[in-house]
Amino acid sequence: MKFKSEKDVFVEALSAAGRVVGRTLGATQGILLALTGNQLTVTGTDLDITTRVTLDVIGFDDGAVLIPARLLVDAVRTLDAGAVTLETKGDKVDVSLGRTNYQLNTYSLVDFPKLPPVAAPTATLTALDFVEGLSQVVRATSSDEARPLLTGVLFTTEDEIGRAHV
């Protein structure tokens, strides 16, 4: 697998997936990178929550690799601005930009948990509508961790009407 991506876009995707990776099980401590054409899918999971981010890259060789999340995120963050190149070489991966090069070990792909396929989106919101709806209800949430049910926001949709309810 080999691709190029702008550092800032890549770091944003890695950070999103890296926030949910597991802390105890080996393979769930990794971020799965899967390249098909010019589409890179970045996946992180702790078996309860999964985050998938898809971004456009310049793809050279399709493939997939499972890399320790913390090492990958830290390595890419330290690079200067520009186009980051990631290339697999056996059980290692090279992350480079300019004269800086990191070589990281990888996990076996067979150890990564099989995730259910992502269903088609049930609703699409603009960022403005999402933020507006969220800002109307988030003040009603509790910060008391003793009652975790009240610390979140539930999103539902009504398909017939096409509105999202927060």
Give the location of each predicted region.
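Structural preference for solvent-exposed beta-strand-turn elements
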Residues: 1-163
